[in-house]
Structure formats: structure tokens, C-alpha cells
Amino acid sequence: MTSQDFINECRYRITYKHNDKVDTLKGEDNFIETENVHCVWFNKSLQNYKGLFIILPLDGKYYECTYNGDKKELYIDTYNKESNECIELKEED
């Protein structure tokens, strides 16, 4: 698997995951395309990959994809942003 293959696979899987949860019975129609999924951070170490993804327009979540090259497994974790707090730190002399 190349780096671009990993990113493309993650974008596809996140799109499917998002669209699978859209409730058309409730009148929701916020389906997305893979073009709406953006990689904001990526790393490759040996045969393993990790990437952070968001959906634009923002859905309030970010997705962490991890590929285990030894087991040929892809894991997707979904996170919700709960808060964003500013903490002022005092500088020491």
C-alpha cells in the first residue's frame, strides 16, 4: 500500500461511514462525497500509516485512521470536539 492508497482508502471508508449514519427517514440529506473528506495530518512509520481526517463542511468530528501493515488492518476512530479552552500560562523569570 502506498501513502496515496492509504489516504484514498481512508477517505472512501470515512465517506461510507458518514453516509451510512444519515437518517433519511428523519429527512436528513447531508450525504457527502469523498471530495469532502480531507487529510489534515499524515505519518508513515515502517509498514504502518496514521492519518487525521475531517469532513468539510465541518461536521464537528475528526477521524483517526491507523493502518497496521503487519495485519493488513485499517482502524477508524471517530472523535467529537467537546471544548476548546484557553489557559493562560505565566512565564517564569
Q: Where are the model-predicted features located?
A:
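Amphipathic, interaction-prone secondary-structure segments
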Residues: 34-73
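A short, surface-exposed interaction/processing loop segment used at functional sites
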Residues: 71-93
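N-terminal trafficking/processing presequences and adjacent post-cleavage segments
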Residues: 1-23
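Intrinsically disordered, low-complexity regulatory segments in eukaryotic proteins
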Residues: 22-38
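Amphipathic alpha-helical interaction segments
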Residues: 14, 49-50, 87
